[in-house]
Design a protein with these regions (language model features):
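Short glycine/acidic-rich loop motifs that flank beta-strands on beta-rich extracellular proteins
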Residues: 88-89, 368-373, 391-398, 414-420, ...
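Predominantly extracellular beta-rich ligand-binding scaffolds that present long acidic/polar faces
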Residues: 87-95, 101, 105, 543-557, ...
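Beta-propeller domains
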Residues: 292-300, 306-310, 332-357, 365-375, ...
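Right-handed parallel beta-helix
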Residues: 355-365, 378-391, 401-415, 427-444, ...
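Bacterial N-terminal signal peptides
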Residues: 4-15
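Extracellular polysaccharide-degrading/modifying enzymes targeting complex plant/algal/animal polysaccharides
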Residues: 22-376, 381, 388, 396, ...
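The right-handed parallel beta-helix/beta-solenoid scaffold, focusing on the short coil/turn
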Residues: 23, 73-75, 82, 88, ...
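Extracellular beta-strand solenoid repeats
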Residues: 78, 85, 91, 105-107, ...
Length: 757
């Protein structure tokens, strides 16, 4: 075996030695776009040297290709360490492509940090002296808040505070008409007008907070007053944003130039921002400006005010007077000892129809939009980059083939992390896009809901070995067919939502072929300890394979919302109340949704727009063919086998939470009327599985585990999560694991150290 490995290694060395060397171009902050870019440093006469911008390097490559053709080894553009300021993204088109054997690579010089920034430094500060402004400031902020003239920096456009295109689930409420999944199999809808990405403020590379109140938590709605009542399965509210608020704090907001509120107005998983139209101080009544929230408003929901000069009351908050172009800021420390930047550029790279282009080892930060967008093309890579402090997403990929995001660190996004969309769903032809070995965390800073760390939609995409944590909503959202999710670690997400999932998909019988395996999901509880799911297959989602996963302290690890043909096997559940949930919602409140799909199938021969009884769907997913003849509303075909359900060696979490003795009944939550439809086989329930070291978080099984006799297969737990290689942006990787809040009692929660990668 060793001899074989040596032979292979030798062949690889020979291959590497004979491969054509790439042509090199150099870029440096002190370069000159009139130079050739063939020298890494300026010559003695300073007549030649590196280029100053990536755009000039791109143009030089275009010239090379026109005169002598693409070099056999491709081209490497090496960026020296230093700061590169962007006003607009670099545009790369089909003419800027490489080939599989001769790629175009833009990379940082080894050992140096090439910092691409869309920010502008703000250095000219002065104290606030205007009596009218001082009068509006919180007493604690007077003398602490400073101001800067953004117009003097040429910054006159500040973006919008209103609704971004918001990904929201359709027909989770009965009063929303279902439109069906789109061509890529996504059941998420883009609602609202497109807006200009907004300016943000950063201090010493940390995002600061647009002034808000409360600084933590929310204000409750005490009563709704809108004239148009709504009733969603007994949950009552109104359509208009007209309500009584608790407390008296909004009294301070009267007279604000541009006051806004952001709230969860009807459901805990759907937010929207509104401009305040009026406040009646005597009645404590607020009206918000239309358009109103999609789902309406109801008593007991929560909101906060923002963009309020009067609410700069703690260090780190800021406000922009958009009419005068003045930034007001309470710095966390004396501003002369720090660095203040405001975001200006929309992003850094925009690839359209480009192929075989790699961005490697670059640090991209402080932009209003998405750092890298890739549209169509093939074989492009974002490798080992750090993408942070972005207004929207880190990387988006739309269409094309085999694009990849590998080994990146991504955090501080206003939206999500990596969005992968591609493949031909009608033909079930895979795109082959992938996200691997990325560390994605602290995202959803601005768009709180449905901005996941990873979003996959289409056919044949893969997410593997990613570490995702600390977010208000989901880690992974997906739609389409034939995706693979494996070796990912997820914790402490869904922190500001109820009824959500760390991994979520929903609402179709045809979104089949997905494999969710060898993932570690832990410390997931939702807002205030409310309902949160590990893997959430919502509203009739069908035919996922959930195997070899480890769930630790997840309130509801696997949730099947009335779907069919799902396989849950060979998983480990530790300290997880109601480890498996399967309901029959299509036989009840979700019946109208199912009826709509059945009607579509009978009248058009399609389900969700696809011809499910014809190839390729009929051959790839045979159970679809006879779906209508097999009581489609019933959750048939679900299998739960060879799983380990263990309350843990500490106090039984289920007994404490549900007030019942630790009997087998509490390991699941299956609707009684459909329990006979679910196949249960060879599960190990509340019998010590004999983990190697449970308290240290090692859930491998010892040789004497009783699970082996049931046919349990080894889970490669040691391979889950990030791994070290030349493509990783950083190593080691440390991440703190947050504790489980109430209602889970502290004595039922064991301390789990962060996993050092």
């Amino acid at each position: 075996m060793k001899q074989s490995l040596l032979v292979v290694a030798g062949l690889l060395l020979v291959s590497a030695a004979t491969a054509a060397e790439p042509r090199q171009l150099f870029v440096a902050p002190q370069g000159n776009d009139h130079w050739s870019g063939r020298l890494a440093e300026p010559n003695a006469a300073r007549t030649d040297g590196p280029l100053a911008t990536i755009q000039a390097a791109r143009d030089a490559i275009r010239g090379i290709k026109k005169t002598t053709g693409l070099p056999p080894g491709g081209v490497v553009v090496e960026l020296a360490g230093g700061r590169y300021e962007f006003a607009e993204p670099v545009e790369l088109a089909a003419e800027d492509s490489g080939t599989p054997d001769a790629p175009i690579v833009y990379r940082a010089r080894p050992g140096q940090k090439a910092l691409l920034t869309g920010g502008r430094r703000v250095v000219a500060w002065s104290p606030v002296t205007d009596p009218a402004i001082l009068d509006r400031l919180d007493p604690a902020a007077r003398g602490k808040v400073i101001q800067a003239d953004l117009k003097s920096l040429g910054i006159t456009e500040y973006g919008d505070l209103g609704l971004d295109p918001a990904w929201e689930l359709q027909l989770r409420l009965a009063n929303v008409d279902h439109q069906g999944e789109d061509a890529m199999g996504s059941t998420f809808a883009s609602v609202g007008k497109r807006v200009r990405p907004r300016l943000e403020v950063f201090f010493n590379d940390e995002p600061m907070c647009l002034s808000q109140w409360p600084n933590q938590g929310f204000i409750k709605i005490e009563e709704v007053l809108g004239p148009t009542e709504i009733d969603v399965r007994g949950v009552k509210g109104c359509k208009e944003g007209f309500f009584v608020y608790e407390g008296d704090r909004p009294r301070r907001w009267v007279g604000e130039r541009d006051a806004w509120v952001q709230g969860y107005w009807f459901r805990d998983w759907a937010q929207q921002r509104h401009k305040i139209e009026s406040i009646d101080l005597d009645r404590r009544v607020m009206r918000v400006a239309a358009p109103y929230h999609t789902y309406g408003y109801r008593k007991g929901q929560w909101f906060r005010g923002f963009n309020l000069l009067s609410e700069i009351d703690v260090p780190g908050e800021w406000y922009v007077d958009r009419d005068r172009g003045v930034l007001y800021f309470w710095p966390p420390q004396p501003v002369e000892r720090g660095r203040v930047e405001v975001s200006v550029a929309p992003g850094f790279f925009r690839l359209t129809d480009a192929s075989y282009v790699t961005l490697r080892g670059l640090q991209m930060e402080t932009a209003r939009g998405t750092a890298v967008t890739i549209t169509r093309g093939a074989g492009c890579r974002v490798v080992g980059c750090t993408l942070r402090n972005l207004g929207t997403h880190a990387v988006t990929v739309t269409d094309g083939k085999e694009h990849g995001v590998v080994g990146c660190d991504m955090y501080g996004m206003g939206g999500g992390g990596v969005y992968l969309v591609g493949g031909d769903r009608k033909a079930l032809a895979p795109a082959g896009h992938f996200a691997e070995n990325n560390h994605i965390h602290h995202y959803g800073r601005w768009e709180r809901m449905y901005r996941p760390g990873l979003f996959l939609s289409g056919v044949g995409l893969r997410a593997s070995h990613n570490l995702i944590h600390d977010a208000p909503h989901s880690a992974i959202l997906f739609g389409g067919n034939d995706h693979v999710f494996e070796y990912n670690e997820i914790h402490n997400v869904c922190n500001e939502s109820h009824d959500c999932g760390a991994i979520y998909a929903g609402r179709s019988w045809t979104l089949r072929g997905h494999v969710i395996q060898y993932n570690y999901l832990h410390h997931l509880c939702g807002k205030d300890g409310g309902p949160c799911n590990g893997i959430y297959l919502d509203d009739l989602f069908s035919s996922a394979t959930v195997q070899g996963n480890v769930f630790y302290q997840v309130l509801r690890p696997v949730f099947i919302g009335g779907g069919r043909d799902n396989l849950v096997e060979n998983n480990v559940f530790v300290d997880c109340p109601k480890a498996i949930h399967i309901d029959a919602r299509a036989l009840g409140w979700c019946g109208p949704h199912a009826d709509g799909r059945i009607k579509e199938a009978l009248e058009k021969g399609t389900l969700g727009g696809v011809r499910y009884r014809e190839p390729p769907f009929s051959t790839r997913y045979p159970p679809l063919v006879n779906l209508l003849a097999e009581d489609p509303k019933s959750p048939r075909g679900n299998v739960v086998e060879r799983n380990i359900f263990w309350a843990g060696s500490g106090e039984d979490i289920r007994r404490v939470q549900f007030g019942a003795p630790p009997t087998d009944v509490w390991w699941d939550s299956i609707a009684p009327k459909i329990r006979a439809l679910v196949k249960f086989e060879d599960n190990l329930i509340n019998k010590d599985p004999k983990f190697v070291d449970e308290r240290a978080g090692n859930f491998q099984l010892r040789a004497d585990s009783p699970a082996w006799k049931l046919g349990f297969q080894r889970i490669p737990f040691d391979k889950i999560g990030l791994y070290q290689d030349a493509c990783r942006a950083s190593w080691p990787v440390r991440h703190a694991v947050g504790p489980m809040p109430q209602p889970v009692p502290p004595k039922a929660v064991k301390k789990t150290p962060s996993r050092k990668k």
